[in-house]
Amino acid sequence: MSNAITMGIFWHLIGAASAACFYAPFKKVKKWSWETMWSVGGIVSWIILPWAISALLLPNFWAYYSSFSLSTLLPVFLFGAMWGIGNINYGLTMRYLGMSMGIGIAIGITLIVGTLMTPIINGNFDVLLNTEGGRMTLLGVLVALIGVGIVTRAGQLKERKMGIKAEEFNLKKGLVLAVMCGIFSAGMSFAMNAAKPMHEAAAALGVDPLYVALPSYVIIMGGGAIINLGFCFIRLAKVKDLSLKADFSLAKPLIIHNVLLSALGGLMWYLQFFFYAWGHARIPAQYDYISWMLHMSFYVLCGGIVGLVLKEWNNAGRRPVTVLSLGCVVIIVAANIVGIGMAN
């Protein structure tokens, strides 16, 4: 396995670790509605950071974006919006299925759809089937899916042992939302594929290869921001128990406390895709679809590890922790299989 591939896998792991931890600061926010908290964090992660970093990277910010036709920018934006819809459905999936089943189904589907649809759309899937390296990377995807399934099973055992139930269990509604979440969340993978002309243009301007994907985030995350912020603002305006004005009428120290924590959560959320771009840059071009598989499987892996570190599994008993550990090992094996396949 080459150093470039190893570093690509490593950066995807770092990004996934940030994704697994990003909600921790949000949990410290006090006396704010979820919608206000999510909006403040989202403005930081989807608008401020993508624009600021792109402005630093590009020699001429406006000239870069105006150089693309609408036919190039629109698919990137729409796939970003598609991914934004997946974000909203993710929370609803947890509500109706519970954390373990919801994560297992949603992440499993988005891993498959986001990973395999890209080579299918590009007409490269038969090449993967007919080459040794391609077949090995596909085997790695399958093993990763098995690992996600094992971690999901560990979560179910934990919930059963600790008496944790879904907020409002509804299998039919939850499954529909989980499938929708899985499909729509893959929009980020599709957006990155559609944004290749933007990456190439950034490289032509002298942007370091590690950073060429970052300017495209202005468009991708702009699409996601409109969906997420629109959802939050509509709820803040229509739901009687929610009030943006009330949330910002608290004591000034508490408002500052909440804004800083929400901004920190937004920063950590953005960093997952900052390092995703670094990892994506190190993956061989013919296997770039693997970036999504690595990100999603490492997200599940890091989520399990973070749960252990935060002692969320302390009262779950030995069996759930053993199953979780097995799932984490399987995901690590999957990453190695994919790495060897890409090296071939």
Swiss-Prot record:
Gene Ontology CC annotations of this record: plasma membrane
Membrane topology of this protein: Multi-pass membrane protein
Keywords from the named record: Cell inner membrane, Cell membrane, Membrane, Sugar transport, Symport, Transmembrane, Transmembrane helix, Transport
Transmembrane segments: 4-24, 38-58, 68-88, 101-121, 137-157, 175-195, 214-234, 259-279, 290-310, 323-343
Annotated InterPro entries: L-rhamnose-proton_sym_RhaT
UniProt keyword Transport, yes or no: yes
UniProt function note: Uptake of L-rhamnose across the cytoplasmic membrane with the concomitant transport of protons into the cell (symport system).
Family that this chain belongs to: Belongs to the L-rhamnose transporter (TC 2.A.7.6) family.
HAMAP family associated with the record: RhaT
Protein name: L-rhamnose-proton symporter
